[in-house]
């Protein structure tokens, strides 16, 4: 089989490519240049897609003895991921750029080009498992499981994907990398949004959206408690950094309950007002009909809650057995049956 190994410059993608070689496949490595002005070096776990990452990917390919190329997808990444990220925050939503990147870049732009060039599949270093029939499952390493950020992929995308690391823990992957002589064996994982290398999401958004001041309002009294520079700096469920001038009468902490970019108003209140029991999402990847009993996950590293899901036209309606807090429009909801991914979508509406 001819496979294209997406090599980020990290340990996971390097070992995934190595395992594809061991499996007897005809492997070609590719590094995705996703920034128009990449930084020279990474700063710990901050960011990725630097020139250092490209060099690390090339060195790994050389050790494996496979051809290596760099594909410039910076323009498409900016349009499909970065611009959408900015637009979402400007509209009061909370997007997950990793989910979006998988949908539009790795398993769309890259996969489409790979198939057009005669490759049979794309190999990545994601920690998830794929059954022979294309069923997506959680990784055996719960701490590193990435099935959530893959949960909105369509069956045809998963059908041409390969995830060789799904049956291994991260510790096993690092030991294997060291044994293979891969210099990235101890390279730190990237934890932050890859295109915001400094980690200051609020400041980064302010540069692109501009200051849009408005009031911070108490949900129960309607009292203005403070001012903000822009709703983009807030997410539903946020507690820190509110800079409120008036403590709550009962002394309890306040959380962001609602964000209204139209009026530039941020509404805050007690934790119990964050409780959500019903979600309406788009039907990004939901092939099932009727009511399906399942478990719902709404954050990349969050827990699951028992739920029922039902397709209604283009909508996916999810009713939760117990409420979850801090869930916002823009997040992905991924639905499971045990470790098996049933599908998912992007949340548009939440309700108590």
Curated annotation (Swiss-Prot):
Keyword Transferase: yes
Pfam families: tRNA_Me_trans (PF03054), tRNA_Me_trans_C (PF20258), tRNA_Me_trans_M (PF20259)
Active site per database record: 101 (nucleophile), 194 (cysteine persulfide intermediate)
BP GO annotations: tRNA wobble position uridine thiolation
Keyword field: ATP-binding, Cytoplasm, Disulfide bond, Nucleotide-binding, RNA-binding, Transferase, tRNA processing, tRNA-binding
Catalytic reactions on record: S-sulfanyl-L-cysteinyl-[protein] + uridine(34) in tRNA + AH2 + ATP = 2-thiouridine(34) in tRNA + L-cysteinyl-[protein] + A + AMP + diphosphate + H(+)
Binding residue positions for ATP: 6-13, 32, 125
Any GO molecular function: tRNA binding
Source species, domain of life: Bacteria
Sequence segments annotated as region (Interaction with tRNA): 144-146
GO cellular component, one term: cytoplasm
SUPFAM superfamilies linked to this entry: Adenine nucleotide alpha hydrolases-like
Protein family membership: Belongs to the MnmA/TRMU family.
Protein name: tRNA-specific 2-thiouridylase MnmA
């Amino acid at each position: 089989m001819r496979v294209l190994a997406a090599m980020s410059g990290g340990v996971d993608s390097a070992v995934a490519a190595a395992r594809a070689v061991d499996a007897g496949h005809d492997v070609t490595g590719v590094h995705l240049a996703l920034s128009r002005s990449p930084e020279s070096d990474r700063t710990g776990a901050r960011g990725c897609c630097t020139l250092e990452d490209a060099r690390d990917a090339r060195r790994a390919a050389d050790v494996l003895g496979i051809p290596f190329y760099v594909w410039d997808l910076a323009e498409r990444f900016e349009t499909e991921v970065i611009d959408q990220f900015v637009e979402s925050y400007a509209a009061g939503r909370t997007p997950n750029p990793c989910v979006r990147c998988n949908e539009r870049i790795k398993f769309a732009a890259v996969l489409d080009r790979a198939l057009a060039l005669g490759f049979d599949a794309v190999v990545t270093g994601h920690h998830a498992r794929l059954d022979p029939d294309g069923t997506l499952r959680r990784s055996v390493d719960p701490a590193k499981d990435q099935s959530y950020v893959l949960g909105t992929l369509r069956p045809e995308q998963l059908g041409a994907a390969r995830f060789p690391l799904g049956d291994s823990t991260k510790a096993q992957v690092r030991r294997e990398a060291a044994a293979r002589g891969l210099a990235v064996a101890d390279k730190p994982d990237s934890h932050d949004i890859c295109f915001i290398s400094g980690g200051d999401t609020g400041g980064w958004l302010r540069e692109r959206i501009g200051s849009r001041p408005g009031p911070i309002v108490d949900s129960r009294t309607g009292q203005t408690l403070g001012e903000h520079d822009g709703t983009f700096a807030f997410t539903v469920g946020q507690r820190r950094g509110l800079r409120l001038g008036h403590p709550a009468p009962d002394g309890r902490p306040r959380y962001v309950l609602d964000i209204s970019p139209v009026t530039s108003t941020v509404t805050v209140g007690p934790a119990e007002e964050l409780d959500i029991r019903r979600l309406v999402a788009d039907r990004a990847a939901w092939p099932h009909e009727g009511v399906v009993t399942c478990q719902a996950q709404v954050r990349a590293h969050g827990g699951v809650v028992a739920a029922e899901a039902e397709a209604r036209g283009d909508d996916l309606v999810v009713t939760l057995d117990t409420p979850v807090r801090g869930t916002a429009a823009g997040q992905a909801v991924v639905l499971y049956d045990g470790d098996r991914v049933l599908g998912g979508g992007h949340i548009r509406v939440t309700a108590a």
